[in-house]
Amino acid sequence: MIRRLAEGRTVRSVGVEEELLIVESGTGRPRALASAVIRAAGPGAEEPGSGELCADERSAGELDAVQPLEFELQKQQLEIDTRPCYSLDELSRELRRCRATAAVAAARAGVTVAALGTSPVAVHPEVVPTSRYQAMAEAFGLTAQEQLTCGCHVHVGISSAEEGVAVLDRIQPWLATLLALSANSPFWQGVDSAYASFRYQAWGRWPCSGPTYQFGSVEVYQATVQQMIDTETLLDSGMVYFDARLSQHYPTVEVRIADVCQHAEDAVLIAALIRGLVETEARNWQAGRSDPPARTEQLRLARWRASRSGLDDVLINPVTFRPDKAVAVTGLLVEHVRDALADAGDTLLVADLLDAVLHRGNGAAAQRSEYQRRGRLVDVITAAAATTTS
């Protein structure tokens, strides 16, 4: 998962998992047609019960043989997974290919897909009938039954679990900025939630989600996970929904904080910044450098603020933990990972992609703008579906 280039540099793999809503073209109403869409994708697609594990729970040998489309918790959504990539151009092509595959399969089933963090219109989610998902619905009640949310998960290659835990410990203050950039879920059950990312608020209902304090070692990380399992509150270790965690089967760090982005290039930006963070903090660990750990309470407040405001108001500065302008906070993140971006050849593209988001706005801004312009939530969904595959 770390490739050595001819000139002696190394570059980390990066892969993206995205969850997409399945919606009716005319009304924007989410449709419980995951099975039909996934069947329409053709050979290699999962069937309910045969693919109960989430993407990062497949065996390492299946890393490059990803399924075209996969089930998620609810019948009104599906998941797409890119292959591991080593350049942002490659990742962009792969992500667009995956989105196009989902759109074509959805069209065959008489629906479409939309990269939206939550459904703008009212919906009654239907849990996919696998034993694991049904057990989750029974154990967690409305938390599971209402959990129709779509996120973007980024996997970045690491050299060892020790390096991975060191990275997890060091990236925590920076993750709220990624949430603000990706925020794409202002509407919930037909009303404006007043949040840029209400998905993050809904996701926070799980007992094991959110930020983590520094672990300090692989042993402590593993012991913490086991202690959580031992409470018999979670079904299994796959329900350890930290905002960033070690993948169970891949040699990667998985950052799970972002909303799914309407624009594919925004997802590429998020992935590039996460890869830059992983590389930067791995270097800091190797050099014996570390900042004083942020309190989990501070991290939670910073992420709440990012969820509430997105890019439209102040964020929490990850260095001072004081309010600061969103453009200043995003600039701090880019400066923090500057050397890693340069070494990966990502500097110019990241600058262009970030400039586009700051000028255009994130997905939440796009949804509210469309609703203000047209006055109908169905138009919000139609516009998002068009952007998803543009």
Which stretches of residues belong to each language-model region?
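C-terminal accessory/tail domains of diverse enzymes
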Residues: 1-105, 109, 125, 203-390
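Metal-dependent DNA replication initiation modules
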Residues: 116, 120-122, 131, 136-152, ...
